[in-house]
């Protein structure tokens, strides 16, 4: 057998899949990399879908990494289908290493008829600046071929279970915290690739009109600064945006609010307890009672971090939301209503505006003034 194909298998047993594809962001002793692939071709004479698995070791020679084994196999397969456009999908236990990432970029550049989507269970060395730059080069090349990288969510794990695992018709049983780990990795990948928000998404969700219908999602944009010589210095690698997770989406049976998703990812930043940090959030809705309580608890447990919250609108479910805002205020979080300056800052920083300036909607300033007065009354416990 060709040595490149020795580690090509048709399927894996359930325990091996759950062990190797577990998506906890930091995992030790997972040195085997699994790559499940699907290859589809376009056109009326397309051959059937090809789907198998390669495996390799992280610390072995580069030629033994599963990505390189796939390329070796694919080069032979491609000779039979040279003129056809191909859609290649990978499902990987680890994202490609730095060298493999560069080889993936070369592979795509040499064959423009191939598109590649990479779903990863975990991110390899995501804190390393060189690795972050390699991922950006692979996924953000504007004038050339690029890969589309995503974090595996419940649907992808279930697909792999059904497609590549000898499950004997057993249902996929997600492990504890699968959806939470997905959100953390999704946010981290967004930070690395510097994802931007669609302009319509921003203007629709951050519009501060007092009466909005159908705005059930909460968007949260954030940035982090570190105090250096009495000056706040922006940490460019620590900014991004996210939204709440709706019920039954990505494995969340009850959903998860944006603020809680945000708190989930902060521990993975490894903020130095000897330094001072300022975290600023720009939210389409102010926090609900539970989220406000959790954010206040975070501040109390992390004295080296200060929190500033700018909200486009005030969330009020006629419950304890006002009490939650007062709890945040008492915990010394700075809570304010977004004004034109904050909307423009978010537009310039978090939106894929393609060079277009921020255009304020009618009565933006008037709505901000009214909401600011209402927030002051809530924090002073007036009329409650």
Swiss-Prot record:
The lineage of its organism: Eukaryota, Metazoa, Chordata, Craniata, Vertebrata. Zn(2+) 2 binds at residues 257, 288, 291. DNA deaminase (cytidine deaminase) which acts as an inhibitor of retrovirus replication and retrotransposon mobility. After the penetration of retroviral nucleocapsids into target cells of infection and the initiation of reverse transcription, it can induce the conversion of cytosine to uracil in the minus-sense single-strand viral DNA, leading to G-to-A hypermutations in the subsequent plus-strand viral DNA. Its cofactor is Zn(2+). GO terms for molecular function: cytidine deaminase activity; RNA binding; zinc ion binding. It is found in: Cytoplasm; Nucleus; Cytoplasm, P-body. Its main location: cytoplasm. Belongs to the cytidine and deoxycytidylate deaminase family. The keyword Metal-binding applies. Its EC number is 3.5.4.38. One of its GO terms (biological process) is cytidine to uridine editing. This is DNA dC->dU-editing enzyme APOBEC-3G. Residues 1-60 are annotated as: Essential for cytoplasmic localization. Pfam families: NAD2 (PF18782). Residues 209-336 are annotated as: Necessary for homooligomerization. Homodimer. The modification Phosphothreonine is found at residues 32, 218. Residues 29-138, 214-328 form the CMP/dCMP-type deaminase domain. The gene is APOBEC3G. GO terms for cellular component: cytoplasm; nucleus; P-body; ribonucleoprotein complex. The record marks 244 as: Interaction with DNA. The keyword Metal-binding applies. InterPro entries: APOBEC/CMP_deaminase_Zn-bd, APOBEC_Cyt_Deaminase, CMP_dCMP_dom, Cytidine_deaminase-like.
């Amino acid at each position: 057998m060709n040595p490149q194909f020795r580690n090509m298998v048709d399927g894996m047993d359930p325990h091996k899949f759950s062990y190797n594809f577990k998506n906890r962001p930091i995992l030790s002793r997972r040195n085997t990399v699994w790559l499940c692939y699907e290859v589809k071709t376009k056109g009326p004479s397309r051959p059937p879908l090809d789907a198998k698995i390669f495996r390799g070791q992280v610390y072995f020679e580069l030629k033994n990494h599963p990505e390189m084994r796939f390329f070796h196999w694919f080069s032979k397969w491609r000779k039979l289908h040279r003129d056809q456009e191909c859609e290649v999908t990978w499902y990987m236990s680890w994202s490609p290493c730095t060298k493999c990432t560069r080889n993936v970029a070369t592979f795509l550049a040499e064959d423009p008829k191939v598109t590649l989507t990479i779903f990863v269970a975990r991110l390899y060395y995501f804190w390393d600046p060189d690795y972050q730059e390699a991922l950006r080069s692979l996924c953000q090349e504007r004038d050339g071929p690029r890969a589309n990288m995503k974090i595996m969510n419940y649907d992808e794990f279930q697909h792999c279970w059904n497609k590549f695992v000898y499950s004997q018709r057993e249902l996929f049983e997600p492990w504890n915290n699968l959806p939470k780990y997905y959100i953390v990795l999704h946010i981290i990948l967004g930070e690395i690739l510097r994802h931007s928000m669609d302009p319509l998404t921003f203007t629709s969700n951050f519009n501060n009109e007092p009466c909005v219908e159908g705005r059930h999602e909460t968007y949260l944009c954030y940035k982090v600064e570190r105090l250096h010589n009495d000056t706040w210095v922006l940490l460019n690698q620590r900014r991004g945006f996210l939204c709440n997770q709706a019920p039954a989406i990505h494995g969340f049976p009850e959903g998860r609010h944006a603020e809680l998703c945000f708190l989930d990812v902060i521990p993975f930043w490894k903020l130095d307890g000897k330094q001072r940090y300022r975290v600023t959030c720009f939210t389409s809705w102010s926090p609900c009672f539970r989220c406000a309580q959790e954010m206040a608890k975070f501040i109390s447990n992390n004295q080296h971090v200060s929190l500033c919250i700018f909200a486009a609108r005030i969330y009020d479910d006629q419950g304890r939301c006002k009490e939650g805002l007062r709890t945040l205020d008492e915990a010394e979080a700075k809570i304010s209503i977004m004004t034109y300056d904050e909307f423009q800052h978010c537009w310039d920083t978090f939106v894929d505006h393609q060079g277009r300036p921020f255009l304020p909607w009618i009565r933006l300033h008037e709505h901000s003034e009214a909401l600011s007065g209402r927030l002051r009354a809530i924090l002073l416990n007036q009329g409650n």
